[in-house]
Every structure is written in C-alpha cells, then in structure tokens.
Design a protein with these regions (language model features):
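Domain-level cores of phosphate- or acyl-group-handling catalytic modules
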Residues: 181, 185-245
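Short secondary-structure boundary/capping segments
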Residues: 85, 144-148, 222-227, 251-257
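Basic, amphipathic alpha-helical segments enriched in Lys/Arg and hydrophobic/aromatic residues
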Residues: 357-430
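Dynamic "connector" segments at or just before major functional cores
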Residues: 1-155, 160-180, 185-201, 385, ...
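Flexible loop/turn segments at secondary-structure boundaries
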Residues: 137-139, 168, 178-181, 214-218, ...
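An anionic, glycine-rich sequence signature occurring as long contiguous blocks
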Residues: 232-352, 435-447
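Short amphipathic alpha-helical "interface-anchor" segments enriched in bulky aromatics
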Residues: 13, 59, 331-382
C-alpha cells in the first residue's frame, strides 16, 4: 500500500514543468557531489509541505513511498540542505523559480495568467494584480528573531506578495515579531522580489494593493517612479488613514456627491456610499504626496460591536479611505477593486496551512530557507490548479484538497515491466484523481 498516493502528482508536476531541474542546476556546487540532489530535496520538501507536513521529520511520509518515488532524503539531509541555503543560493533559487514560472505561464491559454476580477467584472486581461500584506506567526519556544508583537504575542512578522490572478505566493520575507507594519524598505524589497518573479512580458502593467500599513510616502513615491518609466503602467490602491484633514474633507462632501457602493459580486450594497475627497482636502496635505494621487472614502452604517472613533459615533457612519493613481473609472468600482484586496487574507490563511504557520528551527537563517520552501509549495499548489485540477477540485481549501486528492491511498502492483497505482474504486473522487494525474503527465517536458 502507498499512503498519500495523490501527493505524487505534485512531485510529478515539479518535474514536468522543470522546477526540479532548474533548482538542481541553481544549487550545484563545483567540486561537491551531494548524496542527494539538492533540487530534488527541495522539491520533496515542498511536496511534503503541500501534503500537510509541518515539521522536517514529516519527510518520512515521502520516504515511505520510495518504491514509487525512488530514494528520498532523510530528515538530517533536509536539515543540511536548508542550512546550505545561504543568501546567495537563495537568490539563485529565486531566479530558478522565475524561469519556471515564465514557462508555466507560457503554457496557459494565450500565454497569460487568468484575468483578475473586481465587483464581478474582469479587469484588463493584461493587468497583473499584486497584493502585499504582513501577518503574525507565533513562536511557542525561543527562536532567533522571535520577539513580542504589536498584538502582545510572541513570534515573527513575515511579509509577502501574492498574485491575485493566479494565487501564487511570489515573495515571502521573514521578519522579527517587532517589525513595523508600514516599514517602507520591507515593502519595497518584497515587491521588488515579487516583480522579479513575473515573466518579463507581464511586468509592465501592474496594480499593487495594500492595506493602510502600506500608505507611506516612500512606498507611493517608489510606485509612482515605476509608473513613470517608459512602457510601464503601475497603479496602486492603498488604504489611507482617517486623519483630521480627512475628517474635515468628509464634512465638506455634498449629500448629492455620495454614490452607492458595490458588493464583491457587483450588486448595490445597502447603506454604503463612496465619495472622492481629493478636491476637498487642504492642498498643503496633498502637496507632500505623489502627484496624481486620488483620495476616495467609503461610508457604511456600522455593524453592531464595530469599534468607532468619536467622529464616527457622532456622525453615525463608519469611514474607510484609500488612495489610488487610477485616473478613470466609477468611484464605486474603484472602491470595490480596492476591497478585493481582502482576498489576500484567504491567501495568508492558506499559506499558514501550508508551512507558514509553524517555523521548524531555532535559527533564523534556516527558518528563512523554510519559507523559501513554503513559496515552492504555494507555487506547486497554484500550478496544480492552473494546469491539472478538474473543476470539482479547483476551489478546494488546502485541507479539502489533501483529503480528496493528496492523501488518497493506492495499491502498488507490478506487471508487464511496469508499476501501477490502483486507487480504491469506492473513492468518491477517484475520477478526479485520475484526471489530475493524466493532465500532469500531458504537460510537455522542458526542452
């Protein structure tokens, strides 16, 4: 019997798209012959994480499948591999990921990623949407870099960038728990790494979304500079703090200027409106921000128990503002497009269920290497959805995907000089599992 036989499809996918080979080439060291190919080891770790592994010792779940997969590295070898991932090797690893991603996207229809949507409406087919956000990861023991956090917990505060079109986790940076939510250099560094992951042909038309933590002069100036480059269109949609000048501008909005807001599906949202404040703000306030920045505010009747400021208590509305450099479009649509950034919370939750939620080592460098494997696992999951999963499995949460596909058992048989994996006929998703394997094997091997 082979447990978790469905996870073999993830490993096969890594081989078919060329990830294993690219990582092997990137991590080869002259004059050093490793007992286990380092690219294969990292793919096995990513496969283990995708299948639900939380600790390096969980690599034994793949070693159990040696009759199908061949030799699999032991836990000590995995530890050594992660220890060997110096910053220089991590950079080579990221370049390998980018080359593979270019090939994976090239295999999609028309050679482009799925079109992002907002308010139930497709955005520009050429637009790539990047969502940047940070999250807290708790540490339950002393670890290097683990500190007290802003929420009075103990752990780390990594920051990542997700591609909304494909759900890929493009970049992930480990930070101490006391790292700021609005640290400009961290935002710029992780966005630079994320953009470098995109195929060159898809870097020229971007939309960067962030919550209020990204509303810093440095980040918006940097994005404006990218937008000013010839041939580039870089938009942003970033949360904005409700300060006293913003409150004064809200008081100046005529009643007729408020427009109805939209739900995520594009329907009218009751008791919610949007308005633009750009022309109502004190010019001295806007002078310090990049030219072309628009300030848009949304108001909504507060939900029971919602925390309100004194201004909101008095006014009877709850306000949220954001800024964008998009020149055209209805205010309601721009606001709905910004609120679609909330999808990143699902991406973070999935990442925490796929390796991010538990860091294995006391050493900071090894935990950063572990996060690099988490990005590999996220890539493989996203690519599995894009290229192999049938419709019945594409929207599954990680836990459901494991139960239905990755953890299905199979019986290994031999005949005609071939090995066969035989699935239980009673498995409700047996057809979907077979369909997934068939589609993975149909991916053309790298030239």
């Amino acid at each position: 019997m082979v447990a978790h036989a469905g996870a073999i499809s993830v490993r096969l996918l890594a081989d078919r798209v060329g990830l294993t080979g690219e990582l092997s080439s990137a991590l080869t060291r002259r004059g050093f012959a490793a007992g286990h190919d380092r690219g294969r080891v990292l793919v096995d770790v990513a496969t283990m994480i995708t299948a639900g592994g939380e600790a390096i010792a969980d690599i034994d779940t793949l070693r159990h499948q040696a009759q199908v997969l061949g030799p699999v590295a032991s836990a000590p070898t995995v530890w050594r591999t992660l220890y060997e991932l110096t910053p220089a090797r991590l950079r080579r690893m990221e370049k390998a990921r980018a080359r593979v991603r270019s090939r994976v996207w090239g295999l999609l229809p028309d050679g482009r990623p799925p079109t992002a949507t907002a308010a139930g409406v497709p955005l520009d087919p050429d637009l790539v949407v990047l969502d940047v956000d940070a999250t807290l990861v708790l540490a339950h023991s002393e670890k290097e870099g683990a500190t007290g956090t802003r929420k009075k917990t103990f752990g780390f505060h990594p920051i990542g960038v997700w591609c909304d079109n494909t759900t890929e986790l493009l970049a992930l940076q480990l930070r101490p728990g006391n790292a700021g939510s609005n640290t400009v250099t961290d935002h710029i560094d992780v966005l630079t790494a994320a953009i470098a992951q995109l195929p060159a042909a898809h870097r020229r038309q971007l939309l960067v979304r962030a919550d209020g933590a990204g509303a810093s002069h440095g980040l918006l100036d940097w994005l404006t500079g990218l937008d000013a480059k010839r041939g580039y269109r870089v938009g942003y949609s970033v949360g904005f703090a409700i300060t006293e000048p913003v409150r004064q501008a809200i008081c100046l909005v005529p009643a007729a200027a408020w427009q109805v807001a939209l739900n995520a599906d594009g329907d009218v949202r009751e008791h919610a409106d949007v308005a633009e404040l750009t022309g109502l703000l004190d010019p001295t306030v806007l002078a310090s921000w990049p030219p072309g920045m628009r300030v848009i505010v949304r108001r909504e009747h507060p939900h029971p128990g919602a925390p309100l400021t004194l201004f909101e208590h008095r006014d009877g509305w709850r306000y949220q503002a954001f800024v964008t450099n998009t020149e055209s479009g209805q205010l309601a649509f721009l606001e709905a497009r910004h609120r679609a950034h909330a999808r990143v919370e699902d991406r973070i939750r999935h990442a925490k269920d796929t390796g991010l939620g538990r860091l294995p080592s006391r050493e900071y460098a090894i935990n950063q290497a572990w996060l690099a494997c988490v990005t590999l696992a996220a890539d493989l999951t996203a690519w599995l959805r894009l290229h192999a999963l049938p419709d019945s499995l594409k929207t599954c949460e990680p836990k459901a995907l494991r139960y239905r596909l990755l953890h299905v058992p199979a019986r290994l048989t031999r005949g005609g000089r071939r090995r066969h994996l035989r699935l239980p006929e009673s498995w409700p998703w047996a057809v979907a599992v077979l369909d997934t394997f068939t589609r993975v094997m149909a991916i053309p091997a790298p030239g």
